[in-house]
Amino acid sequence: MSMSKLARKGSTRRAAALATAAAFLLFAAAPALAHSFLVDANPSSKDHVDAMPKTIKLKFGAGVEPAYSTLSIESGDGKVLAKGAVGKPETPRELTLDAPGDLAPGRYVVRYRVLSQDGHIVEGNYEFFLDAKK
């Protein structure tokens, strides 16, 4: 076998090894994309609502562990008005929190800290507004 054929064979093997390594890294990273990021909420971010909903409902992109997760509603000045989290086995990607009634119009913040079923903690917050009754 000539030297050029050996060199081509070696470069083909290197290319195959690099392609295999790239595929492995691509598929190994997939579980990291499964963290429980917020995908829907009621009320949602920047919503203006005429009445406070009875329940705050958050939906995540992957399952969460309710026993190790917390939701809270805060007033615009940072006072915690309600805290907790309720999850149901039939809807593992959703958490709810009973909202306090009789709140004054203004800005409210929903904070969440959830434990994903993949073991990662995801935290975030958003605001919504309770408008004055007309």
Each model region followed by its residue ranges:
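Short, surface-exposed alpha-helix to beta-strand junction/turn motifs within ectodomains of secreted
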Residues: 57-58, 62-81
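N-terminal signal peptide c-region/cleavage motif recognized by signal peptidases
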Residues: 29-31
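N-terminal edge beta-strand
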Residues: 34-52
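Aromatic sugar-binding surface patches on proteins
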Residues: 91-97
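Extended, polar beta-sheet/loop recognition surfaces of beta-rich domains
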Residues: 51, 55-62, 119-134
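Bacterial N-terminal signal peptides that target proteins for export
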Residues: 2-19
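A glycine-anchored, Pro-Gly-centered beta-turn/N-cap motif
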Residues: 99, 104-110
